């Protein structure tokens, strides 16, 4: 029997060999291309992802680094399984600096030679994987591939990219555990992993790394936030739509550079830190759609810079402190779907507020008396019972030594809790006031982050209303990946998010000024709208976001409207920026797709998301207490104008000098409150971090699935003609090292790759 099997295998080998020879161009010997093709197919199934590239001796290269770049890019080209827009069709020959999406600049250690400093293939709809050979691009400063269909994992040899400043892998189909190789990149400042399928825990080392922006929302991460969370120097961090649980870390109050933070739609279950008021520079604070309990700390009234405050869809109780509603910059306060029993009259005079579904006497649309009675009859929450980290000094009571045996020992002294002094860090530079026009949070059902599938190119402003993806499927993605236009053509890349379909209006846009604007162009919305989640506490099943219209699989990203997107919404495949020339300035417009595909990024996109369809509020639950976390959070549109100064000028194109970006301008997370209320936030141009929602997971080669239908995306239609965030070269507050890296700074561009601003 064994011999028979061996004979069959031998004949099978001969048949395959015959077929291979039959396709040979010369009839007898396989061409180099055919050999590489066979190798690539084998590598997809076996061994590590690496390809042997043979360099034609007749090719001449300016220097060895460009030769290495040729090898890396040819290996990558072979790892591409689908390139419907022919972005890599001109990746031929030795002049790698003329390849579409590849940008060269003088080397940092030798200005006389050119080297590949940036790669920008945003919104190219390419399917494939990242080969290990990419580690040969030793001078690479920025790597932007958002809104494609890349799958697999991040190559281990990325650890050789010692100059990499911006890494944007958002809105793809990467999977597996957190890519720890990014922790080995010494120059990395901007990390965007949004809208992928990463899972498991996030290494605590991430929060000790010197980063300025962390976007890991819309994945499948599940873990408790570590005690060193507060050690992170970031100005913007978005963890929304994952499966984090446990405490809100008490160390959170130590994040002195923090401008925007979004915990929305996770499973956090604790009280808010009592000294949360130490966050003096925060402009956007969103902890909606969790399971937080206890009162709203009085110290929230000390967060003097906050513009967008969202604590909706939790189980908070007590009275709203009047000091919170008197904050000087507060524009949108959403505290619906809790169990608050009192609010100061001043709260009713805020520009935008939502107090529905509480237990407030005399106010409309409150919970039923039965629900309120059932909840309030329970024992009050003891916030000290949560072990939430290092805020409490010695937990155990201090026991004084017992006196002599004859005397009874005195009772041990009560434990002493040292409360850290509140920091009064000066408020962040006054960024333009973000425009918060989030509609009031819809009924319990979390607002759907349904990135509207904008079918046509940039027609309507993209509406990014990502549905909360609490359910099994990956969270609907508002895609925040700012894809730079990457069509083969040389024209400068337009990072304008594709126009979202008019139907689903984005949730309220919070445009906090301070946060840095990461304008990663949002992936083009795909036609399919995201479903509206109007469900009660249980988060609606995440609908896989519709694939962005353009290749980007995910549907439109939310509007994290970072700096106003350049007017040009990248047409489905806007041509990539000219080869070496620096790309146009991209305000870190993350996803906000400019309304019209205008190649010039500066124009502010007009976001007039159609009013979200009325979200059908599920009838108030019976008297039973709604302890279950409220429905998935509504899409939060923090359209905070990009913080003026954040300039990570590491645009993909020409040499970008990565001077450590000044503290990014305020990122605008437009996390819409429940759809019903449309908050037209103030002047600041909304920053749309519209990273397209990640396309539903599909085979690598599969095009992104259409986005789910968006139900009631609350964002009120607004045309935000917010000029791109001032790209003022401010010294970045965070002392980021000046990156005089391969790419010269792109004027007016914050983070070169329009990383979707922090949002979902």
Swiss-Prot record:
Modification after translation, per record: Hydroxylated on proline residues in the S-P-P-P-P repeat. O-glycosylated on hydroxyprolines.
Database matches in InterPro entries: Leu-rich_rpt, LRR_dom_sf, LRR_extensin-like_regulator, LRR_N_plant-typ
Keywords in alphabetical order: Cell wall, Cell wall biogenesis/degradation, Glycoprotein, Hydroxylation, Leucine-rich repeat, Repeat, Secreted, Signal
GO cellular component terms attached to this protein's record: extracellular region; plant-type cell wall; plasmodesma; secretory vesicle
Contains the Ser-Pro(4) repeats as annotated region, ranges: 409-758
Tissue note: Expressed in roots, stems, leaves and flowers, mostly in vascular tissues.
Biological process according to GO: cell wall organization
Main location: secreted
Glycosylated residues, chain numbering: 16, 86, 98, 281, 332
Metal-binding is among the record's keywords: no
Quaternary data: Interacts with SH3P1.
Known function: Modulates cell morphogenesis by regulating cell wall formation and assembly, and/or growth polarization.
Record protein name field: Leucine-rich repeat extensin-like protein 3
Gene: LRX3
